[in-house]
From Swiss-Prot:
Reported function: Antimicrobial protein. Has antibacterial activity against the Gram-positive bacterium M.luteus (MIC=8.6 uM). Lacks antibacterial activity against the Gram-positive bacteria B.circulans, L.monocytogenes, S.aureus, and S.lutea, and the Gram-negative bacteria E.coli D31, E.coli ATCC 25922, and S.typhimurium. Lacks antifungal activity against S.cerevisiae, P.pastoris, Z.marxianus, C.albicans, C.fructus, C.wickerhamii, A.niger, F.oxysporum, and T.harizianum.
Lineage of producing organism: Eukaryota, Metazoa, Ecdysozoa, Arthropoda, Hexapoda
Factors inducing expression: By bacterial infection.
Signal peptide residue numbers: none
Organism: Galleria mellonella (Greater wax moth)
Main localization of the protein described in the UniProt heading: secreted
UniProt entry keywords in alphabetical sequence: Antibiotic, Antimicrobial, Immunity, Innate immunity, Secreted
Expressed in which tissues: Hemolymph.
Record-given protein name: Proline-rich antimicrobial peptide 2
GO biological process terms, semicolon-separated: defense response to Gram-positive bacterium; innate immune response
Cellular-component GO terms for this entry: extracellular space
Localization terms from the record: Secreted
Length: 42
């Protein structure tokens, strides 16, 4: 199991959710991929 600190906690590293991005950062465990960061707007 891949354990990452917020905001890098995702149910699956290969299944992005239709969420707001803020911003696109390099994939923590795969430099060749990018992953949307969950925008924490309250």
């Amino acid at each position: 199991e891949i354990r990452l600190p917020e905001p890098f906690r995702f149910p699956s590293p290969t299944v992005p959710k239709p969420i707001d991005i803020d911003p696109i950062l390099p994939h923590p465990w795969s430099p060749r991929q990018t992953y949307p960061i969950i925008a924490r707007r309250s």
